[in-house]
Swiss-Prot record:
GO terms for biological process: locomotor rhythm; NADP metabolic process; response to light stimulus. Mg(2+) binds at residue 363. The gene is cu. It catalyses: NADP(+) + H2O = phosphate + NAD(+); NADPH + H2O = phosphate + NADH. It comes from Drosophila melanogaster (Fruit fly). Induction: Nutritional conditions, such as food deprivation, and higher temperature during the larval stage increase protein expression in the adult flies. Levels of expression at the pupal stage are phenocritical for the cu-dependent wing phenotype. In the dorsal neurons DN3, a subgroup of clock neurons, accumulates rhythmically with a peak around ZT12. Binds 2 magnesium ions, but the ions are only loosely bound to the protein. This is Nocturnin.
Amino acid sequence: MDQKTTGLRENYGHRRQPALGKAMPVTALLLNLESNPLDYSRNDIGAELLEDDDKPPQLFSVTDEPPSPNEEDYKPPNHHEDDGKLAGERHREIPCSNCLKTAPGHLIDRQSAINEMCQRLCGPECRRPQGLTLDGVRQDFLRQYEIAEAVAKTSAMTSTVQMKQRLAARKLEFEKEMEMDEQLGVASPRNDINLGQSSTVAATGMGEFEFEPPRDLLLYLVRMGSFNSAPKINNVDSQDDGLVLPSGLSTPALLQHVQQLRGGGIEQPSLLTRGFLKPLLADEDVADGLRCLKLNSVSRVCSAPVEGDDIRLLQWNILSQTLGQHNDGFVRCPEEALTWEHRKYLIVQEILQNQPDVICLQEVDHFKFLQTVLGSQNYAGIFFPKPDSPCLYIEQNNGPDGCAIFYKRDKLQLQGYDTRILEVWRVQSNQVAIAARLRMRSSGREFCVATTHLKARHGALLAKLRNEQGRDLIRFVKQFAGDTPLLLCGDFNAEPVEPIYATILGCDLLRLGSAYADVKLDREEILHPNADVGEFVAKSMKREPPYTTWKIREEGEECHTIDYVFYTPDRLKIKNCLDFPAGEQIGKNRTPSFQYPSDHFSLVCDFELLPPTENGKESGSGSGSDGENETEVEGSKHGSIQ
């Protein structure tokens, strides 16, 4: 290799190869045609182009002269035999009469060239196959059809024009759905909200009129975000195997320890300060009757309440390390702030300083680390990965990402849990859910907690897909929880104006409310809203926080609410919620940053578990494992428990 070539390759780096010569046409790639590299490349990089350099490469060998009859290896030409096969072709066809008549004069004696020209320019309908059986014709047709179908799919998924046509068609379908609902007298869950892409409530919709997209399009949508064109790298969660923590550390001591580890002897920016929406005690450092921690150097939040039937829930998308560092494109976040060595200790601080009883996490791809650290503080965890996590298509991944639930073992007892891969129109998607039944050790009362992470990306089709995932989620949690009080939380990737929000709040099977929307309301107003479903959802939507995620990516700045904590109002009383930092606190570069490890903010809610009503039942029927204590509950078919 000459010096020019070597220099060019060095400039491109080890992952990217320089493109020399002409590119092979897409049709040739679909036909699996092998090209001769000698016909494409030049070693005289930087030299003047020759006259032949602008000519397209020859994908088929065309001989200038036919073999002489006097040669020993001469065989009479037989155009019915295959001496130059295409993929999917079993025979050599005779050129059609048009090509024989209109062929240029210099090609008259070159039958192979005329034959190739005919195959390129003419369809099979104008040529008569020779010497083929019916079975051969059928197989050739099927193979040609597969090629045409592959080209059509590629065009359908990449064409901007066709994408607009599909979205326009979906808009008409949504309008048709609403017209049918009105004609049939089906009440819309949000009849006073102009969505443009609304949908009926999950469990009460008219199934026989539901739109179901073509299966090919559906499979494309549910897998969108997984890098299927790249090789899959099935790594396991092993990057934190060497983690060693001092034994017997209390929570304050552990927080101080991780602060020192994060700084490495150098002072680092402190975690963002946050407060609760309702005022707490004036002196947060008083430990009389409360398990409060002296955390003013970290945050001004108070630890979990000590009343026997109070529950503190922390919901958080912690940002997958693999995706955040290698794929999500946080253009304003310093590279060092995205490293796992920096982020993991901030994640621990954000969780432990709030002292939650139940922790629900999404985008977890370092479960062993959390299991080790939180396990030292008497938490136990359940993890369920995505079936086709996009992390697995990125080099140096730490295994798949998924959802996790942790619970405080000295306060709560695991009675059973279940996991599910959410389905969309009876097709498994790439999103998952976990549900767990927990029992209060102090009173014996039970409640269920469920978490999920719905499909990301914008657009009417994806909003409809999320809504269908929500319907399947409702069926799953209702079957598991029965009449037990329910906490349903997660990253729903949908703003309140999307159909999934109304689907969950308007579902008569669950009768849920939104914790952050209800926290400042009177108890009576929550239990008796005096409004129909549409008005109830509209009011709740307006009371949601302005944002739960605030980030800057390559495509622009995103600031919206897509994370929620839903609860059963008649059995759980919302007492307080952790507020979100203001824009000036976050900084102009937004999140993630040196002061916050994720692009989502954690949601922290305090609930009081109420005694059952006269018509209610303390525990409902549901699926999952049952046992007397958490050590007797084994892992489900898909999940893992530690």
